[in-house]
Amino acid sequence: TTKYEHVIPQLVAVQEDPAIEGLLVLLNTVGGDVEAGLALAELIASISKPSAAVVLGGGHSIGIPLAVSAQRSFIVPTATMTVHPVRHSGMILGVPQTMRWFEQMQERITGFVASHSGISEKRYTELMMRTGELVMDVGTVLDGRKAVREKLIDELGGLSDALAWLYREIEGK
């Protein structure tokens, strides 16, 4: 599914349940619903308990804000993340207001990613608007090492690395 709303009550439960000491988010997504994904990312970012995210296979499109929403992000070397402009399937009105809506949505995503990772808005936009890498499209595909090098993701690592970080954070509280 590309809908994520069913996860919202589960995240609220993580925050509210005193028996839960931390949050681990495992990501393997091609992306999907931009509004729902950004809402989830904002919710994860606002959880006061230690949180870590691991990109395992794909962290494409709206998966990027989800990956960087945790306090610490990890990515396995073979995972990929596709940075591209907001897209829409189906019919749209070809009017200036529609273009402005797309621009505003992209600004929201870019701002969120830049404020929750080490990448600048300028660099993220450069990667998003790059031509020549994707066939008949704009954007950039980053593997795990490149995502860390671009400061989009905090560190290269998998499940055990994320769990070790979470346990250290929980013990430190």
Model regions: which residues?
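N-terminal organellar transit peptides
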Residues: 1-54, 58-64, 68-84, 88-173
